[in-house]
Amino acid sequence: SVRQLERLGIRTVGALAAADADVLEQRLGKGGRLLHAYANGYDPAPVHRIADLPPPKSIGNSATAPRDLICEADARAALLSLAESVGARLRLEGYQCRTVELSVRTADLHWRSHRMALRHPSDLTSELLDAALALCEQAHLWPDPLRSIGIRALDLVPACAPHQLDLFEDAEHRARQRQLDITLDNLRARYGKTCVLRGRACFDPALGLVQREEHAFLRK
């Protein structure tokens, strides 16, 4: 296409915009007319509302730990940070997930993944963490040390979409949990990700993916 445009004396966007669209179509096919439209700032593709766009297939995060994870307590510290990250992205983009996937890589570099369907769509950090920990227990990961670990939210639906209530669901408790998560999201967006930490992250800042020098309370 570049060579054919040069043969027509077209070397700049301005020259392309001023060219004859019919001639461009004759020489380049339908792509020639499309290039002419783009050069003139016109995109013939229909405009879609964000709500009409299909949701992403998944939202996830993973990390390689600074040391091997050798027990459930190690995994919990790392998964808490990952669950907060994935939950924050779900809430920011306006989605909830119906499935949680746990992925791990052992110290001998073998990958494993396990999935769990949730009782109801969720973007709550606590529910993502609980699902990931349940998958850890079901997978019988130990005593094999883990080198890296990740959480992925699958089967996404818009957070505003209606869902059937569970007879045993504590809607008020979930609403309070979500408001707490949103408050933490807003604080971290304004003051930095380490402005508020959950207590567990302070026991092993490295596994909680918190840099000690970034937070005054963790400095020696």
Describe every region a protein language model picked out.
Residues P121-K220:
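Acidic, metal-coordinating catalytic segment for phosphate/diphosphate chemistry
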Residues V2-L146:
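DNA-contacting surface of Y-family translesion DNA polymerases
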